[in-house]
């Protein structure tokens, strides 16, 4: 089954000075199983705060840069439909295997759509996913996407996400730490920056903040901040 999807955004992601954001960086992380960013259980902040979105069961949740997160299993098991976007095809192969699903695979523009049982994953560059491809989503859950992009790309990413998700409400989780102590990803995103990206479109509510046990990678004391974004 394994074949690498063409990286439509390779030039975009590889031209960030000083940061290795070439798609091959992420492919190699998955191929070498260097996926410390992958959590072995549903994210506790999702479990605790998802209700803040007030989304009825049966609605469709978009999870950008989803990897093979168990958050998808958690959402599906609670009766939601899920859409995701992920660069690494290997991650999505593993996701469907772990979910016990056999996907139907279809080329859509410069990405592939893997679909089965209330789940649609767009495999390829998220910047190649359009509003039409994605279809209707009722909410966004962003735990791993905004913090994966360096500062140079975060403005473009947030504008793109807002557009393709049609300004749907969002549960956003960010990291905040002294960036000089550790090179990302994940990158530090300040509360001020969250406002800069989203305050024009959304009413923002800061829900919670929790210390990262042991710091990020054992190098930097850090907090995870939880935000609720509702369309103005």
PLM feature spans:
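A short acidic, Gly/Pro-enriched loop at the edge of an enzyme's catalytic core
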Residues: 132-140
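Basic polycationic patches enriched in arginine
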Residues: 3-4
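Class I (Rossmann-like) S-adenosyl-L-methionine-dependent methyltransferase catalytic domain
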Residues: 21-55, 68-72, 84-119, 123-133, ...
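Class I SAM-dependent methyltransferase "Motif I" SAM/SAH-binding loop
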Residues: 62-67
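Gly/Ala-rich phosphate-binding loop of Rossmann-like dinucleotide-binding domains
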Residues: 76-77
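Short, Lys/Arg-enriched N-terminal segments with co-localized hydrophobic residues
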Residues: 7-20
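A short, conserved alpha-helix within the catalytic core of class I
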Residues: 148-160
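Nucleotide donor/acceptor-binding cores
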Residues: 58-60
């Amino acid at each position: 089954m394994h074949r690498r999807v063409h990286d439509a955004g390779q030039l975009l992601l590889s031209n960030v000075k000083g940061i290795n954001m070439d798609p091959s960086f992420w492919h190699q992380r998955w191929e070498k199983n260097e996926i410390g960013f992958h959590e072995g259980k549903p994210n506790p902040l999702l479990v605790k705060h998802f209700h803040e979105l007030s989304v009825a069961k049966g609605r469709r949740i978009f999870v950008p840069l989803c990897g093979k997160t168990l958050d998808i299993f958690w959402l599906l098991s609670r009766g939601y439909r899920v859409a995701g976007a992920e660069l690494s095809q290997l991650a999505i192969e593993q996701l469907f295997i772990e979910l016990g699903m056999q996907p139907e695979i279809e080329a859509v523009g410069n990405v592939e759509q893997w679909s089965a049982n209330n789940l649609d994953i767009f495999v390829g560059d998220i910047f190649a996913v359009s509003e039409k491809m994605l279809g209707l989503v009722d909410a966004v859950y962003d735990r791993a996407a905004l913090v994966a992009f360096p500062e140079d790309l975060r403005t473009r990413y947030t504008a793109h996400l807002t557009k393709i998700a049609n300004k749907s409400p969002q549960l956003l989780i960010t990291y905040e730490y002294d960036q000089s102590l550790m090179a990302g990803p994940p990158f530090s995103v300040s509360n001020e920056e969250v406002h800069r990206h989203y305050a024009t479109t959304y009413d923002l509510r800061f829900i919670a903040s929790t210390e990262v046990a042991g710091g990020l990678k054992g190098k930097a004391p850090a907090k995870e901040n939880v935000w609720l974004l509702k369309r103005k």
